[in-house]
Amino acid sequence: MADIGIVGENEYVEKGQEAKLIKRLGFSKCRLSLAIPKDEEYKGAEWFEGKTIATSYPAILRSFLEERGVKADIHVISGSVEIAPGIGLADAIFDIVSSGSTLVSNQLREVEVVLPCEALLIANNNLSKEKLEILDELLFRFEAIQVAEGKKYVLLNAPKEKLDEIIEVLPGMKSPTITPLANDEWVSVQSVIAEKHFWETVSYTHLRAHETEADL
């Protein structure tokens, strides 16, 4: 048995969660959904009453149906679940959906999202002290990458007289780093900002510096 592993949440939930969930990793996001023929009218989970549903995830599907009080036949198949309605094996499917293009190509439409999924870091419940220390180090590295995701490192030179204005829009993760330059009237500013605000922030700081230069 492995000490640690990265698995899809769909597999982790379906197989009974024997390993310990350590961390959600935030990538390979998808969902386990119910889909029916695109021309069928759908008003709720009762549509599945008495129907046959093809899936590779019977445990998760069974739990969902029981919660909704729906009785349906579960037809377990491995792979190519999406073709089951088209060849008469099932009335609907319960499968992994990402973009939804596979459903469209098989004349199906998504009607119920049962379980949003992503990659999970899991571990054996009986790790030794030494292995737990290694796991902690690995977690530190994973978390560093996750924190850095969607961030930009910005390095710019700015006039001292505009520094307070620039810091207002360039705060950094805690505080920007300010370094003196050979020209006493200017400083170097280093910061980390959200990528989605990168251009508006850079444009603002550039404008402030440009206005100052024009006044010199």
What are these regions (language model features)?
Residues 146-159:
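Short glycine-/aliphatic-rich beta-strand segments at the starts of folded cytosolic domains
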Residues 20-71, 126-128, 139-140:
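A conserved helix-loop-strand patch within extracytoplasmic ligand-binding domains
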Residues 205, 209-212:
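Conserved small/polar residues in nucleotide/adenosyl-binding loops
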Residues 2-12, 94-101, 160:
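Beta->alpha turn/N-cap motifs
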Residues 13-24, 101-116:
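Ligand-binding "clamshell"
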Residues 28-34, 116-121, 152:
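Small-molecule pocket liners
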Residues 158-176:
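Short amphipathic alpha-helix segments
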Residues 74-85:
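Short helix-initiation/N-cap motifs at beta->coil->alpha
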